[in-house]
Amino acid sequence: MKLDVIKLDGGKAGSVDLDDAIFGIDEIRGDILQRVVTWQLAKRRSGNHKIQVRNEVSRTSKKMYKQKGTGGARHGSRRAAQFVGGAKAHGPVVRSHAFDLPKKIRALALRHALSSKAKAGSLVVVDSVALTEAKTAALRATFDKIGLKNALVIAGPEVDANFKLAARNIPNVDVLPNAGLNVYDVLRRQTLVLTKDAVEAISARFAEKEAA
């Protein structure tokens, strides 16, 4: 697959060959994308919600009244869940929501996510994102010129410092180095912007996985 390369100012900068095995998958597997997005979001959950159980409630554990002779129901501690101020039965506890997902599934999902952007015409390749100065207003005007309203920008191994500073206050624009490329962030933004360095790094990344 061949795609035109543009400059940040909208000018043409040649073209780049994209690997069809990464960017040219025809049948997008939504089920695999859903599995990986769920896996990513589950890992992010803090899991620190907590409720007091019986041994943690600050109430006496003394028996409420004698077992027999009152005509009432038999009760023990006031910490029991049926009493106001008592414990919570089977409440949430601190735990991890993360679960395992095979690396091959995660890699396949990333291929499908990248291919979905290319198939939808939402993939843009720029020659470079290096800026001479960190000016948010200037970068916003540049994005407006090339039609970027909601985008994920993937740079090479390192993100240009001026570009990172200029872009961080622009809403609906995320900037990540190549190592940060992931399925969730690709799908949550309308347009995927890759630098030429990022394209090369992505191809090398999948080549290493296939060789392993």
Curated annotation (Swiss-Prot):
One GO biological process term: translation
Coiled-coil zones: none
Keywords: Ribonucleoprotein, Ribosomal protein, RNA-binding, rRNA-binding
InterPro entries named in the record: Ribosomal_uL4, Ribosomal_uL4-like, Ribosomal_uL4_dom_sf
UniProt signal peptide: none
Entry's Gene Ontology molecular function annotations: rRNA binding; structural constituent of ribosome
Disulfide-bond pairs as recorded: none
Source domain of life: Bacteria
Entry GO terms, CC: ribonucleoprotein complex; ribosome
Assembly mode: Part of the 50S ribosomal subunit.
Functional description taken from the UniProt entry: One of the primary rRNA binding proteins, this protein initially binds near the 5'-end of the 23S rRNA. It is important during the early stages of 50S assembly. It makes multiple contacts with different domains of the 23S rRNA in the assembled 50S subunit and ribosome. Forms part of the polypeptide exit tunnel.
Stated family: Belongs to the universal ribosomal protein uL4 family.
Protein name: Large ribosomal subunit protein uL4
Gene assigned in the entry: rplD
